[in-house]
Structure formats: structure tokens, C-alpha cells
Amino acid sequence: MRSAQVYRWQIPMDAGVVLRDRRLKTRDGLYVCLREGEREGWGEISPLPGFSQENWEEAQSVLLAWVNNWLAGDCELPQMPSVAFGVSCALAELTDTLPQAANYRAAPLCNGDPDDLILKLADMPGEKVAKVKVGLYEAVRDGMVVNLLLEAIPDLHLRLDANRAWTPLKGQQFAKYVNPDYRHRIAFLEEPCKTRDDSRAFARETGIAIAWDESLREPDFAFVAEEGVRAVVIKPTLTGSLEKVREQVQAAHALGLTAVISSSIESSLGLTQLARIAAWLTPDTIPGLDTLDLMQAQQVRRWPGSPLPLVDADVQEQLL
């Protein structure tokens, strides 16, 4: 006997969360809970404004239609990426095919005063890997901050993300202020320039390795080994089903590329599932999941060690 619930939710964000020049005041999304006999599976559907093709209203319509079909015995996954991901997670939990083991290590997202960051990062236990957003301020300032962090902490490796913010000139301005002796400790820089060709040229000219992120979701993208390309950053909410995520990870690994499972600012429920996916598909790589502190609450499942209050599903708006 099958049954299902769908919930709509909204979480207030901390002030100052900006995505592509848009302030994100709340994170909006949906949960689906599927039950079959004694088994249960949860999934999160939370399109990311400015990044997802769909908004949450469109996702809601597709999700409700899919759930009704599933209740009638049809299991074909929807095509919409955020819905396909959430539904496939719920089905994987239902069938016990998503392993419970999780990688809760996260590359901390660094912002704020560089002196404070140095103290925080110096005290990090184990492998020191952190993420810095660049491209929000002047490229010269970004270069100086990155250089300062690498100089102050000799065993630090940085993942940088420019979100295609730079022209070739801006990229060169950034690199000019990063000591060539430190550049090998930039694990990768995600999508530095507005075009892939400019990003490839940036890698060749600076010796700073790059990673593809947005490119993975473009129709002409193909997995190929290229000089200067070290990694791919996979955001499952923007990608689609678990099977598609797995295919992309396998394609990257086959070329010797690092694959990083990364957050699209999911709630704690989605983040804990991403931590499980990372442990399953990319066990040797620290995932990019340090986004929970951007929110003011956790929902349904706790992220270990988070002090944020937990909100249960039964206080959310139930749609089904």
C-alpha cells in the first residue's frame, strides 16, 4: 500500500545572502515523503533562484502530478532537475539504496575579515580545505585576500568560485596578486570567466587550475580531459536524478578529474542527503556543503553539530 505527503516550506535566511545580484531573504521549497508498507523515504525539492531553470511553483505542479502517478503505480521520473533529484532521493531511501554513511566534513565557506579567517582556518583539524567566493568585489582585492590566506597558512588549499564574473582582464588582475609559488595550493577556481574559452585561457596563462560548474548544465558540454581543468562541481538539485549525478561523477573520475558534490543552499534535510551521496560517490573528496549557517533553522533532520533550532515537518504547510 502506497501513501505520500507533500509539504511546502520557507526558511528565513541570514541578512546579506546575495545570489547573482539578488538578495535571498527566504529559502523556499518542498518535501516529499513516500511510504510503501513499513518503509519510508524523504526528498527535498528546492529550486535555487537565479540558477535553476524552474521556480518552486513550477516544481510544485510537477511534483504533485508525479506523486499522484506514483500512487497509481507509475515510477517514471520527471525531467525537471530539482523534482527529479528530490523524488529519486525519496525513492532511494524507500528502497534502501542510498547508503546511510555520510561525509559531514565540509570545506568551510570563508567570508569576512581576513585576519579572523586566518585564525579560524589555522585551527582547522586535519586536511585544511576551504572555499572563497571571488568576483563579488574588485579582482585585485580578491587576489590580495587569497594570497594573504595562502601565505599565512602554509598547509591550506583553497577552492575558489568566481561564477563567471570576470573578463580576461579581471582574471589577469586577480592572478597578478597571487604569488606564483602559492598558486598550486589553489585546488581549483570554478568558472573564472564569462566563457569557457576565456576560462581555459586563464588556466593556461596563470597556471591556476579551473573547475567546471555552470558548464555541466549547458547542452553542448562534454566530459573531456583538458589542460588546466582539474575538477567538476556537481550540484544535484540543479543536475537531476541520482542516476544522472552518478553518471556525471563516473564520467569525471574516468578522466582523472575530481568530482565535488556541492550544495545549492538546501535545507538540513537535503544537506544530510548530499553528505550521504558524497560519501557514496566521492568518498575521497571533501564535499562543498557549508551553507546551513546561511539559514535561521534546520528542518526535519539535523546536521550533526549545528546549533540551529530544528523544525518538524508537521508544522509545514501540507499540500497532499
Swiss-Prot record:
Mg(2+) binds at residues 161, 190, 213. Pathway: Quinol/quinone metabolism; 1,4-dihydroxy-2-naphthoate biosynthesis; 1,4-dihydroxy-2-naphthoate from chorismate: step 4/7; Quinol/quinone metabolism; menaquinone biosynthesis. Its EC number is 4.2.1.113. The active site is at 133 (proton donor), 235 (proton acceptor). Belongs to the mandelate racemase/muconate lactonizing enzyme family. MenC type 1 subfamily. NCBIfam families: menC_gam_Gplu (TIGR01927), PRK05105.1 (NF003473). This is o-succinylbenzoate synthase. It comes from Shigella flexneri. The lineage of its organism: Bacteria, Pseudomonadati, Pseudomonadota, Gammaproteobacteria, Enterobacterales.
